[in-house]
Amino acid sequence: MDKFTKLTGVAAPLPIVNIDTDMIIPKDYLKTIKRTGLGKGLFAEMRFNEDGSENPDFVLNKPGYRKAQILVAGDNFGCGSSREHAPWALLDYGIRCVISTSFADIFYNNCFKNGILPIKVAQEDLDKLMDDASRGANATLTIDLETKQIHGPDGGTISFDLDDFKRHCLLNGLDDIGLTMEKAKSIDTFEAKNAEERPWA
């Protein structure tokens, strides 16, 4: 998993509340267990018309936002089913950070396991960031995970809270496998000692 330390990128505004995982990645794209290739299905029912053509009104189809790495979204982002394909689709598209006032718990935790930083902010801060993100190609934010701060295009700074363990995992690029490997030496030591003390086990 790629480390997340500091990210400077275009932020796309998506001021819609209760965006569920089916909206993030429709069920038609859930037939695979691969984490790659799902970016094409991200927000498919909003990004594309019924004939498959792009919906020019959707933010990620607008000039300046096509390569957005940050999403500024409405309240309760990621609600609905627990499909892990939702963060997979975001990451495959290129989104590394989602900012909202709240997230569904399962989606929130799945983001950390896949190298995405979900940031919770107060409504007044979200409103400010939504305004910043509405500047099109100039909608650049800097997310500094080490200092837990968001720097806006006008020089303003917003601080955010984050669990120390989750922050540690993102800063060091540790998913569940990475965490296990980090403890590999301790595991080997325990197994050797256990085999010596309990050879019958």
UniProtKB/Swiss-Prot annotation:
Subunit (UniProt): Heterodimer of LeuC and LeuD.
Put simply, this protein is called 3-isopropylmalate dehydratase small subunit
CDD domains named among the record's database cross-references = IPMI_Swivel (cd01577)
Question: Keywords in UniProt for this one?
Answer: Amino-acid biosynthesis, Branched-chain amino acid biosynthesis, Leucine biosynthesis, Lyase
What's one GO BP annotation on this UniProt entry? L-leucine biosynthetic process
HAMAP family to which the protein is assigned, alphabetical = LeuD_type1
Q: Record's NCBIfam families?
A: leuD, PRK01641.1
